[in-house]
């Protein structure tokens, strides 16, 4: 029970412990699914779009949480993200899957390049920098 309460707290859902799941919004259900995963104390988390239905503040909080768990508890995290700027901010490595079957994998700094992502998405992207942070925006 303590593990469940800790997971709910980590996701900002501690006051939802007694709520019927059917009364939760899509974002609240997504956060509950992540809390459920956390109670299992996995060594590997495979996450397909864990940020779907989440407001930006919750998206960043979830990514920060998984980054901390990876760093502090040795959790291996593999996730599908479509927000390239959040991936740039949080990922160590990236895998780009192209429609023709080829792929590019490697460190984020090498893989998440405007030229490659332009090919992937079929839309021009350009890179902006703000200090040490990089951002990719539509060209």
Q: Whereabouts are the PLM-identified features?
A:
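H-loop (His-switch) and adjacent beta-strand-loop-beta switch element
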Residues: 94-107
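H-loop/switch region of ABC-family ATPase nucleotide-binding domains
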Residues: 81-82
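Catalytic Walker B motif of ABC-type/P-loop ATPase nucleotide-binding domains
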Residues: 45-49
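Conserved ABC ATPase signature
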Residues: 20-24, 28
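Helical segment within the ABC ATPase nucleotide-binding domain
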Residues: 59-73
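Conserved ABC ATPase "signature" region
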Residues: 1-16
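ABC ATPase nucleotide-binding domains
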Residues: 114, 118-139
């Amino acid at each position: 029970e303590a593990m469940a309460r800790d997971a709910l707290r980590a996701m900002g859902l501690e006051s939802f412990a007694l709520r019927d799941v059917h009364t939760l919004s899509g974002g609240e259900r997504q956060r509950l699914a992540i809390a459920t995963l956390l109670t299992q104390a996995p060594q590997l988390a495979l996450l397909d779009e864990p940020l779907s239905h989440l407001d930006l503040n919750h998206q960043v909080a979830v990514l920060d949480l998984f980054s901390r768990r990876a760093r502090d508890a040795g959790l291996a995290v593999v996730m599908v993200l479509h927000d390239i700027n959040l991936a740039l901010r949080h990922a160590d490595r990236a895998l780009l899957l192209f429609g023709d079957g080829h792929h590019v994998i490697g460190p984020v700094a090498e893989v998440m390049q405007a030229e490659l992502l332009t090919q992937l998405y079929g839309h021009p992207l350009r890179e902006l920098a703000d200090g040490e942070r990089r951002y990719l925006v539509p060209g």
